[in-house]
A protein has these predicted regions:
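Short amphipathic helical patch at the helix-1/turn junction of helix-turn-helix
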Residues: 105, 139-140
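Conserved catalytic-core motifs of GNAT/GCN5-like acyltransferases
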Residues: 135-137, 150, 155-176
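Conserved hydrophobic/aromatic beta-strand scaffold that supports enzyme active sites
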Residues: 5-7, 76, 176
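Short glycine/proline-centered loop/turn elements that form peptide/ligand docking sites
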Residues: 119, 142-145, 162-168
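Structural motif
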Residues: 129, 147, 151-152
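Oxyanion-binding and handling regions
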Residues: 1-33
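Acetyl-CoA-dependent GNAT
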Residues: 40-112, 116-129, 159-162, 178-188
Length: 188
């Protein structure tokens, strides 16, 4: 048998992917680190979803907007951490593309990979529906969101003039961004 360092023999170092699968590390810390799997949003989630949306958006969706999205059958998911709402996303499946209508993560949980997890989930749902890509709009003034989407492979494909409400009754353009995803069973 070849000699190997202790950290290799005893597997004390783990990759991020291994840690997210629950391997290695302090077992008491695992529940706090594991982001969980998005679950379908229900009417019972709406109070928390509306509160989170109001906390993170300058011009938030209303309870009626969320209820209408659920009633229309849009893909709507919540992500919980230790029973508490951490984030959510809503996607409308069009004939050729999934349209990400809204995505949000609790500000206290930013920079922990939860937004990426939700975005990956939306992309996976698009693949499973046989769609070619995910489309979204984002405010140009939201530089952190624009950067986030670019880091995740989204490209700007257009601009929607006057799309968003803005301060003092004005309007703000939207950057239209899209990422192509291979449909489930298709060659990437």
């Amino acid at each position: 048998e070849l000699a190997a360092p202790l950290y290799v023999r005893d597997k004390v170092a783990f990759t991020t992917a291994e840690r997210l699968r629950g391997e290695g590390g302090n077992p008491k810390a695992r529940p706090a680190l594991a982001p969980g799997v998005p679950q379908p949003m229900t009417d019972a989630d709406l109070d928390e979803v509306v509160a989170l949306e109001a906390h993170v958006q300058a011009f938030p969706w209303t309870r009626g907007n969320f209820a209408d999205a659920l009633a229309a059958g849009y893909g709507a998911w919540v992500l919980r951490r230790e029973g508490r709402l951490a984030g959510f996303c809503i996607v409308m499946h069009a004939p050729d593309v999934a349209h990400l209508l809204v995505i949000a993560v609790d500000k206290a949980l930013h920079r922990q990979g939860l937004g990426g997890l939700l975005l990956d989930w939306c992309e996976q749902q698009a693949r499973e529906h046989g769609l070619e890509g995910v489309l979204l709009e984002v405010r140009p003034s939201n530089a952190s969101a624009v950067s986030f989407y670019k880091r995740h492979g989204y490209l700007q494909i257009g601009v929607r003039r006057g799309y968003y409400p803005a301060e003092k009754g004005g309007r703000e353009d939207a950057l239209v961004m899209q990422k192509r995803v291979a449909a489930a069973g298709a060659a990437a």
